[in-house]
């Protein structure tokens, strides 16, 4: 690892446009980081293909293959901890993480949410914003 670079784990569920933005920023030296691990909870998420195209380790962890949420999150935690990451980026990750996971990585998780919170939490936020008649929208990045 190059000194003074953050070691990242990126959690994804879809196309990976946020992952690509992170990769691009690293490649342009605009972000002093390296991606140690990309994990998806969706088998055919294009984000995993993006990761592999850039030589990054990408894993699919199927939440349905675990007996319960805690078992899934425990395995996810172990995989992340094995990479000694400094920061976890939830970049289009469409699962709500439990208290135990959040506490294990206290002050080391950053989330990108595709709406201006608290106006539109949850899923399908842009659609809901349009249906609500919102005059503007945006995204929220919270730590």
Language model regions located:
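One-carbon transfer enzymes
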Residues: 1-143
